[in-house]
A protein has these predicted regions:
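N-terminal first-folded block
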Residues: 3-39
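N-terminal loops that bind phosphate or other acidic moieties
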Residues: 3-9, 52, 96-107
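Glycine-rich, flexible loop/turn motifs
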Residues: 9, 15, 43, 54, ...
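Amphipathic, hydrophobic secondary-structure cores in small proteins
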Residues: 21, 29, 34-81
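C-terminal structural segments of small proteins and small subunits
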Residues: 71-100
Length: 107
C-alpha cells in the first residue's frame, strides 16, 4: 500500500562545487532506483528529484539547504539513500584525488 503522507528530510550541500552535473547525475541515478515520487525543495522552489535539468536549475551551491521529499512505499529507504549521498558530498574528494593521479600521467 502506498503511503500518501510525504516523508521529508533536510540536508545541506557540503561538496565545494555544489550540485553540478556529476553529483546531480548521481542523485538522479539513485532516485530512479525507487518507486517513490521524489522532489527537491530549495527556498520554496519544488522540482522533480528524478530530473537532471530540474535539479541543475536549482543552482544549489555549497552550504545550500535542500529539503528532500519522498512519497510512496519505499519513501523512507529512498530518503536514507539520498540523504547519505548528499551528506557524503557525493564522494567528490575521491574524484578530485583520482583526477590528480590521472593528470600526472600526462606530465
Amino acid at each position: 500500500m502506498m503511503s500518501t503522507k510525504p516523508s521529508l528530510r533536510t540536508v545541506t550541500v557540503s561538496n565545494p562545487q555544489g550540485m553540478h552535473a556529476r553529483p546531480v547525475d548521481l542523485f538522479v541515478k539513485t532516485a530512479l532506483q525507487f518507486e517513490s515520487k521524489i522532489q527537491l525543495v530549495k527556498d520554496g522552489e519544488r522540482v522533480d528529484g528524478k530530473s537532471i535539468l530540474a535539479i541543475l536549475a536549482l543552482g544549489a551551491q555549497q552550504g545550500t539547504q535542500l529539503a528532500i521529499e519522498a512519497i510512496g512505499s519505499d519513501a523512507d529507504i529512498a530518503l536514507d539513500a539520498l540523504v547519505t549521498l548528499v551528506e557524503q558530498g557525493f564522494d567528490e574528494e575521491d574524484v578530485d584525488q583520482q583526477q590528480i593521479v590521472d593528470n600526472s600521467k600526462f606530465s
